[in-house]
Curated annotation (Swiss-Prot):
Signal sequence residues: none
Subcellular location(s) per record: Mitochondrion; Membrane
Coiled-coil intervals: none
Biased composition (Polar residues): 59-70
Name the UniProt record assigns to this protein: Probable endonuclease LCL3
Family of the protein in this entry: Belongs to the LCL3 family.
Major subcellular location class: mitochondrion
Enzyme nomenclature, EC number: 3.1.-.-
Length: 348
């Protein structure tokens, strides 16, 4: 049984060692507490025991607190700003931000800037770019006014509070573009002292029902002598909202206009469009649509013939008025000359 006592003794030895270690640790803790209690309290004048005093550090601190007004030029030039800007971490974001701002400005000027009047349209638009807007009024059978809305609904028009098309006539003054339909000529309404041409009210009513308050796409070609923009106009109408329709072509098919006839300066938007317009006019003429009803009868005249006749009448009136004015002036001069002579034919 001796080996049992030996084994039990070997097992108790570590326990005794652990007890001794715990006792030693307790003694060390007591010594540490005593040393802390015996250490004098720190004061602003006394240095930290773990950090010995440094003469250079105290000098720098004293200088910084004693002179609050520092030399800013020295402090700014002391930093390597050029190196900071050349750092890719700063240079790349700066270039991206600057490029993005310039790109947005260019997009706004080229595509999102609103054009208030026809006279504000740059010649760079003609035959190259288009305008998008809403029709606010129809003045005649072949012209109307449009409020330019660049970008359409994608740019916030019609649904953002600050991008609304005005409805009041007073608010639309000097803010709409006057459009003249290219390639067609509709009967004239009464204006400038001229009487109305047959089917002029019908053509005006047709165009009003077709375009008023609709969004249209305008392809400008030039400005005419009245400050209007001669352009081809497209509109989308229900139920064929995915198919845009040429407004001038639709008027020719309905017999509400004729192909514009002039010696020079006629805009169609291309030779192909002119031939298409003439075919549509020929079909409407054969079927007697609109103003082509009874066009073979006596007294019928096209819009161009009406304009030529009215121009002749106005020319005759102007010539007669000029002759009457000259005769009156001559008569007044003759009466004045007779008054200057005496009874015996001598001057007074």
């Amino acid at each position: 049984m001796r080996w049992l006592f030996w084994s039990s003794g070997s097992q108790q030895a570590p326990n005794n060692k652990d007890n001794n270690n715990s006792n030693n640790n307790d003694d060390d803790d007591d010594d540490y507490d005593n040393n802390i209690n015996k250490r004098p309290p720190l004061t602003p004048e006394s240095p930290s025991p773990s950090h010995p005093p440094c003469a250079s550090c105290s000098t720098q601190a004293t200088a910084s607190f004693s002179n609050p007004r520092r030399d800013w030029n020295t402090s700014l030039t002391a930093h390597d700003w050029a190196g900071e800007f050349k750092d890719p971490r700063n240079l790349i974001p700066t270039l991206l931000l600057t490029g993005g701002i310039l790109f947005c400005v260019r997009i706004h000027r080229q595509y999102l800037r609103r054009i208030p009047l026809a006279t504000n349209i740059s010649p760079t638009y003609f035959h190259k770019r288009s305008l998008f807007g809403r029709v606010t009024s129809v003045g005649d059978g072949d012209n109307f006014r449009m409020y330019h809305t660049p970008g359409g609904r994608l740019a916030g028009w019609e649904w953002l509070p600050f991008r609304r098309v005005p409805r009041v006539k007073k608010e639309l003054k000097d803010r709409t573009i006057h459009i003249r339909l290219a390639g067609i000529d509709a009967p004239e309404l009464p204006h400038f002292g001229r009487p109305a041409q047959p089917y002029s009210h019908a053509a005006h009513t047709w165009l009003t029902n077709y375009l008023l308050n609709k969004r249209v796409r305008v392809f400008p070609y030039r400005q005419d002598q009245y400050g209007r923009v001669v352009a081809t106009v497209y509109v989308r109408r229900f139920p064929w909202i995915f198919l845009r329709r040429d407004v001038g072509l639709q008027m020719l098919r309905a017999g509400m206009a004729t192909v514009y006839e002039a010696k020079s300066g006629v805009e169609f938007g291309g030779e192909g469009k002119e031939s298409k317009y003439r075919r549509a006019e020929e079909v409407a003429k054969r079927r007697g649509r609109g103003l082509w009803k009874g066009w073979k009868g006596v007294g019928w005249e096209s819009p161009r013939e009406y304009k030529n006749r009215m121009a002749g009448v106005e020319g005759e009136k102007a010539a007669a008025a000029a002759a009457a004015a000259a005769a009156a002036a001559a008569a007044a001069a003759g009466v004045g000359g007779m008054g200057e002579l005496g009874v015996n034919g001598e001057k007074n």
